[in-house]
Amino acid sequence: MPTIFRSLSTTQLIKSLRTSSGAGMMECKQALLECGNNLDEALDWLRKYGSAKATQKTAGRENSEGQVSVLMKSDYKSCTTMTVKSETDFASRSDLFTKFVEDVTNRVNTNTSSTTQKTFTEAELLAMTDVKTCLDEAMVSIRENLQLSSATQTTVQQDSNFLNYYIHNKAPSSDWVGQIAAIVEIASSSPSPSPPSPDQLEIGRKLAMHVAAAKPSYATIEQIPTSTIEKEKEIMLEQMKDTNKPPEVMEKIVNGKLRKFYEENVLEEQGHMVEAENPKIKSFLKSQGLSLVNFVLHSIK
C-alpha cells in the first residue's frame, strides 16, 4: 500500500472514496478490498465496475427524464447542444446531474471543430475517451443508468450569420442547462459584427423563445417537402369532395387552408409571440435587416 494511504484507517479510506466518487458505502468498501486499500486504484475500479453495475441493475428501465444544454461560442457562430437522459426527475433536477451535463457538454465541445455541422450518435460520443470517463463517474455518483441521447454541433452557414438560443425551465444552478433548448440562425443583410450587436442578440433570443413555445416544424416554406404539401392538398380536397363546389372555389379554399397550415407549422409564417403586437416573423426580421436561416429545437418531453 502506498505510504500516503497507510496512515488512514479503513473507515477514513471509505469516507475519502465516497467523497471523491459519490458511490455508496458498500461499493466503496468493495472497491478498496479489490484494490488493496489503494484509493486511486479503487476510484478507477468504481469507474469501470460501478458504472457497469448501475447499467445491469437498471437495464430495461426507461430513460424518460433529463436535461438539455447549449454551450455557445463567444462569437455566436457555433454551439454544442446535448440531450442527456436519466431515469427519474429526482436525479435530473439535482445539482450533481446538472454539473455532469455541463462537464460532458464541455468535453464534447473540445472534441469537435467549430466549423463542423454534425449530429453525433451515442456510439460516437462514447468513443470519446474523456466523455466516456465523465459518464462512468456520473453513473457511480448518481446511481442511475444515464444516457447520452444526442449531441449536435451547430455552425453558421455563412460568416455573416449569427446564432442565439433560449433555455426554458433552466436548472437552478446553470444558465445554459434546462428542459427545452431552442437555437436560431439569423442572416444579416449587411456585414454582422462579431460578436453580433446587443440588439441582434436580443432579437435572436426572443425568436428562440418563440420557437421553444410554438414548436414549429419548419423554418421556411421552402423547407417543406413537396410530398408533404401534396398530401395536405389531397386531404383538403377529400374533405370537400361532396360539397359540389366549383373548382375555382375549391382552389381558393385549399389555398386558405394551406396558409393556415403554414402559420401553424412554419416559423417564418407565424405571428411573433414575444414581440409587441405579434408581427409576422418574416416581416419583422426583414424590417430589422435580418432573415431567418434555420432553427434547432431540443426537448426532453
Which sequence ranges carry the predicted segments?
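N-terminal assembly/interaction segments in proteins that build large macromolecular machines
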Residues: 2-301
